[in-house]
Amino acid sequence: VILLSAAQSRELDRLSQTSYGIDSYRLMTRAGEAVASAVVQRWPEALAAGALVVAGKGNNGGDGFVAARKLREDGAPVSVLLLARTADLKGDAALAYADYVAAGGGIIEAADESSLANQHPGVVIDAIFGTGLNAEIRGSIHGVIEALNRFEVPIVAIDIASGVNADSGAVMGVAVRAALTVTFGYAKYGHVSYPGAGFCGALEVADIGFAAEAIDKISPHGRLIERAEAARLISPRSTNTHKGTYGHVLGVAGSRGKGGAALLVGRGALRAGTGLVTVAIPECVATIVAAGQPELMTEPIADHNGHFASEATIARLTDLIPGMNVVVAGPGIGTSDDTRKVLEWLIREGAAPDRPLLIDADGLNVLAPADPALFKAARGPIVLTPHPGEMARLLSSTTAAVNANRMGAAQRLAEMTDAHVLLKGARSVIVTSASAVRINSSGNPGMATAGMGDVLGGIVGSLMGQGIEPGDALTLGVYVHGHTADRLAARVGSFGYLAGDLAAELPAAFTEIVG
């Protein structure tokens, strides 16, 4: 599913008009009519109490006037509050207002929060701000949006919930909590990336007649990862193969009390189809790991206070790594000084053009804050997979700031490090370059449990080891991880399934995705 930025959306609109002769007011009319149609289809009974359209002075407000006119034509009671003067309306918005008034509609202009006091609609239509909003909402409109959110009726947002940044999903001070958003042509990043996704409600993408050829000129790089996208990345297996065909993954994981992390990395890699998996582990957890999964090969390494001893670890990895297709490092390794030395060495020496290095969990924490020079010195692809807390430490930020603009945080880390970045969480964000952003659609709250990230690291490492390039391995791995969890939740509910359960379910999930 294609995702557009606000600028790309404007360019699609402009090209449709200037290069392909599509009338701008016709586009506005179709947009407003699509909104009215969605309201009638979803809330016909609520419309008996009337629709309240709250409009701004721009084209989003113009769409609102069209929707109001269409609903009146369909027999619904309609009220319109304009958060500006009618003299402020320009262009197509002014034309839409004139057509609405000509059809017998009335408005309250220069409306504010107090104007809502006597309104008792069955449905509210948010036509305040569109996808162009890029500044904090303050003043009277802030109060209007807060008041709208107190209405106990469905709110339908036109194009995007007012207050949500279309490029990042960030909330610009305050945002309308919509039950439904009707957008036009293509979804935008802010519709599907949290926190904005939580304000937009259900998403309906209406075809209003943009020129199909225009999208090719825009060349959008954003994608919402759904099943078809994941299935495209799974190649059929030849009958004439052997275990070496499907790669050799090296996991560098575990410490005293966290041997399970190494096990889960290994299980994720094995269940995602890797031919061979070796886990390098501190000697203190070697027995536990070896007994936990007989298909894993183990490389016990001398430890220091329960963690990898740096000199012994680097010496052993120097011998091991040349025979590997990919390295997954970090889960459960702790944050000692020895660990830091191992991770820095891996970045400088472990990655190669044909051998990606994935760093997760403690491997990220011990490297925080991120040193751009260190990462940019790597000789091969680096993949970083932080959750919001780890991202905050890498960026010298806060978890709250990361969650307020998840896309921005992922893009910033990718730019700093030249790495492929996955920011985990609801609607995980993948950044493979400055312009290529992918957002995952699968997964559920049951995944908020220990070890899920370790399994994911194993899955993505497995896919890279099988020859899938890092960006696509992240795309497929994250989707499969979430889809597998969705299978479990459908069967047992979203409480209490474990990371190990997810690993065991992976083969069936891959088979289902391929169909």
Question: What residues fall within each predicted segment?
Answer:
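Small-residue (G/A/S/T)-rich helix-start motifs and N-terminal tracts that mark the onset
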Residues: V1-A84, K90, A94, L180, ...
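Internal gly/pro-rich beta-alpha loop/helix module
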Residues: Q119-V123, I128-P220
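Short amphipathic alpha-helical segment within the helicase RecA-like ATPase core
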Residues: V80, G91, E109, E113, ...
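Structural alpha-helical scaffold elements that stabilize or flank donor/cofactor-binding regions
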Residues: L116-N118, V174-A175, D319-L320, L413
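Short acidic low-complexity segments
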Residues: I107-Q119, L317
